[in-house]
């Protein structure tokens, strides 16, 4: 005789399929509440910046607001621990950073990049005999006189043979600490855990590089004192900006961060940038192209680019010891824009209660200032293609909800 409405499952004490729904709804409500805390901080910063215009003053006041910062840090840690980890399997931003570092430092990625540099330099000298000395050296970069058998080249490749020195800016809860290959320094304006140092990266003072052996530099990092107000230049193999740059209300603040990262990295070190975006890859290619041009102008070369369902992930390699940007002929800081930079105060308030989507025409008008960016269909060390001129617009930080 077949079981009745109770069924075998009920006889064995199994829950009906919809029993987990209340728990899932509760989890989503908590996630929305936490993401609301984070987004409200971002919105207030952008609103103040539009009203006042003095990003130094706004940032100083923000860093003094201990209650808001503490609430933000707790919300971010809770989101990362209890929500993002459960909904982003296979798309973890931390795992991506580790994978890129292993590929670059341990599995030949760095060697291949340096070999490409030398081939480009040799090709440039063969195909452009009419160039003067200044133009030629500009094209060839830092590896003009670097042979694969030279001591300098061997030293460069072995520099990170020990632990990879990694600076995690806006670390919150120090997610890289658990990985053995890294000597991690996590910094944040309000740390969520004790292992993260208190530090305002925007106002971090940079000192002369240490003239020490690698093991002595490692020892120096292990003895840092809290809070951190200054650091020597050329100290780290990796600098990570995970969901950091979109926190700042001003493109110039994002620019300052990238410039400081360049100065803190050793030659051929990596800058890893993760920024939120839930749209498909091509829709926001214009912004990514703009960011690439601005960041490379500092003395970087893009090594890798990936698009996950809720974020862009970029790796840039430091290719020159000094920053090279010409801010007179081009507004590179302004090229580090995010969609929210174009919002009005009314639109920010409106986005609290409903989802507003601009028309294609409004998108084109907002992005008009960036339509003349140079084309670069193959624009990275890895030869990845990212060519698109489709404009975009977005109000929120969608990664926070991950719906």
From Swiss-Prot:
Oligomeric and partner information: Interacts with the GATOR1 complex; interaction is disrupted when SAMTOR binds S-adenosyl-L-methionine. Interacts with the KICSTOR complex; interaction is disrupted when SAMTOR binds S-adenosyl-L-methionine.
Acyltransferase keyword on record: no
Broad EC category: transferase
Family per similarity comment: Belongs to the BMT2/SAMTOR family.
Gene this protein is translated from: Samtor
Matches recorded under InterPro entries: Bmt2/SAMTOR (IPR021867), SAM-dependent_MTases_sf (IPR029063)
Record field: compositional bias (Low complexity): 11-22
Annotated region (Disordered), positions in chain: 1-32
UniProt-annotated binding residues for S-adenosyl-L-methionine: 93, 170, 188, 200-201, 242
Compositionally biased tracts (Gly residues): 1-10
Pfam families: Bmt2
Cystine connections: none
Signal peptide from the UniProt entry: none
Main function: S-adenosyl-L-methionine-binding protein that acts as an inhibitor of mTORC1 signaling via interaction with the GATOR1 and KICSTOR complexes. Acts as a sensor of S-adenosyl-L-methionine to signal methionine sufficiency to mTORC1: in presence of methionine, binds S-adenosyl-L-methionine, leading to disrupt interaction with the GATOR1 and KICSTOR complexes and promote mTORC1 signaling. Upon methionine starvation, S-adenosyl-L-methionine levels are reduced, thereby promoting the association with GATOR1 and KICSTOR, leading to inhibit mTORC1 signaling.
GO biological process, one term: regulation of TORC1 signaling
EC number: 2.1.1.-
HAMAP family named among the record's database cross-references: BMT2 (MF_03044)
Keywords: Methyltransferase, S-adenosyl-L-methionine, Transferase
Basic and acidic residues composition-biased segments: 23-32
Native species: Mus musculus
GO molecular function terms listed in the Swiss-Prot or TrEMBL record: methyltransferase activity; protein-containing complex binding; S-adenosyl-L-methionine binding
Parts forming coiled coils: none
Official protein name in the record: S-adenosylmethionine sensor upstream of mTORC1
């Amino acid at each position: 005789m077949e079981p009745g409405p109770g069924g075998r499952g009920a006889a064995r004490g199994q829950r009906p399929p919809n029993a987990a729904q209340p728990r899932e709804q509760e989890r989503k409500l908590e996630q929305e509440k936490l993401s609301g805390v984070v987004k409200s901080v971002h919105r207030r910063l952008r609103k103040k910046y539009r009203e006042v215009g003095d990003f130094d003053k706004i940032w100083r006041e923000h860093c003094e607001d201990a209650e808001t910062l503490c609430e933000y840090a707790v919300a971010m840690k809770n989101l990362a621990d209890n929500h993002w980890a459960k909904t982003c399997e296979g798309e973890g931003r931390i795992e991506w950073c580790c994978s890129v570092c292993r590929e670059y430092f341990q599995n030949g990625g760095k060697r291949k990049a340096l070999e490409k540099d030398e081939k480009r330099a040799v090709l440039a000298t063969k195909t452009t005999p009419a160039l003067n000395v200044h133009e030629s050296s500009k094209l060839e970069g830092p590896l003009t006189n670097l042979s694969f058998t030279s001591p300098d080249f061997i030293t460069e490749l072995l520099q990170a043979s020990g632990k990879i020195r990694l600076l995690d800016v806006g670390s919150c809860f120090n997610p890289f600490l658990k990985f053995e290959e890294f000597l991690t320094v996590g910094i944040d304006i309000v740390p969520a855990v004790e292992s993260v140092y208190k530090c305002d990266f925007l106002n971090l003072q940079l000192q002369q590089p240490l003239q020490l052996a690698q093991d002595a530099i490692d020892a120096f990092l292990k003895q840092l004192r809290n809070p951190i107000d200054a650091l020597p230049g050329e100290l780290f193999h990796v600098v990570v900006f995970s969901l950091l740059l979109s926190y700042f209300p001003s493109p110039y603040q994002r620019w300052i961060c990238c410039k400081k990262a360049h100065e803190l990295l050793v030659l051929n070190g990596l800058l890893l940038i993760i920024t939120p975006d839930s749209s498909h890859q091509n829709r926001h290619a214009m912004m990514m192209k703009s960011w690439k041009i601005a960041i490379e102008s500092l003395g970087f070369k893009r090594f890798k680019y990936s698009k996950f369902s809720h974020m862009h992930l970029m790796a840039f390699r430091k290719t020159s010891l000094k920053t090279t940007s010409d801010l007179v002929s081009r507004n590179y800081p302004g090229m580090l824009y995010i969609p929210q930079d174009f919002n009005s105060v009314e639109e920010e308030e409106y986005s609290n209660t409903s989802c507003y989507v601009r028309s294609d025409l409004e998108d084109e008008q907002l992005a008009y200032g960036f339509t003349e960016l140079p084309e670069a269909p193959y624009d990275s060390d890895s030869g990845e293609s990212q060519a698109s001129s489709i404009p975009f617009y977005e109000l929120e930080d969608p990664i926070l909800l991950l719906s």
